[in-house]
A protein has these predicted regions:
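Peripheral (often C-terminal) accessory segments that flank ATP-dependent C-N-forming ligase machineries
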Residues: 67, 98-141
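A short glycine-rich, hydrophobically flanked beta-strand micro-motif that places a catalytic Asp/Glu
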Residues: 57-69
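Surface-exposed helix-capping loop/turn segments at secondary-structure junctions
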Residues: 53-58, 107
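ATP-dependent carboxylate/phosphate-activation module, predominantly the ATP-grasp catalytic core
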Residues: 1-55, 66, 78-101, 121-124
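Pre-DFG segment of protein kinase catalytic domains
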Residues: 74-76
Length: 141
C-alpha cells in the first residue's frame, strides 16, 4: 500500500560507505519508470544494520516497502546492483566504479549525493534503407 524503495548500498567488510534510497514513483510490473533519490533516515539505519550483521561488501540492492503507517518493511536483499543504477551515478556517486576501486584495493572516496529524479520512457527508432530516424511532433509521414 505504501511507497517502495530500491536502495543502493555500497559497503566494505560490514561498513556502509553509501546508502542511496531510491523512491520508485511510477512502476510498470517490476520496472521503475519514474524514480528519485531521496534521503530516508529510517531506511538508511536499517541498511546500516543489515550491512553490519551480514558483513556485506561491494554493491548491494536492498528493497523496502512502506506500510500504510509509513513503516519500512524489508522485501529483499540482492547481492547485485539494481536496474536503475544510472540514477545514483547521475546523482554523483558512481557505484560500479567504486566496486572496481574496492576490488583493486584502492581507497573509497567520499562523494556528495545530489537528489535527482529520473524519468524513463520508450521511443521508437526506425532503420530504413540504412537510414536511422525517429518520428516526432515535427515529422511528416
Amino acid at each position: 500500500p505504501g511507497d517502495e524503495y530500491s536502495t543502493y548500498v555500497f559497503a566494505e567488510k560490514g561498513k556502509m560507505h553509501y546508502c542511496i534510497p531510491n523512491l520508485r514513483q511510477k512502476l510498470d510490473r517490476y520496472y521503475s519508470f519514474e524514480a528519485k533519490t531521496q534521503k530516508n533516515p529510517k531506511i538508511e539505519n536499517m541498511c546500516k544494520k543489515i550491512v553490519k550483521e551480514l558483513d556485506l561488501s561491494s554493491n548491494v540492492n536492498i528493497q523496502f516497502k512502506n506500510t500504510k503507517n509509513k513503516i519500512p518493511k524489508l522485501i529483499e536483499i540482492n547481492p547485485r546492483i539494481g536496474g536503475t543504477i544510472i540514477l545514483p551515478s547521475v546523482s554523483g556517486i558512481n557505484l560500479p566504479y567504486l566496486a572496481v576501486k574496492l576490488c583493486l584495493g584502492e581507497k573509497i572516496p567520499t562523494k556528495k549525493l545530489t537528489e535527482t529524479k529520473m524519468i524513463r520512457y520508450w521511443k521508437e527508432v526506425f532503420i530504413k534503407d540504412s537510414e536511422t530516424f525517429e518520428i516526432n511532433n515535427n515529422s511528416r509521414i
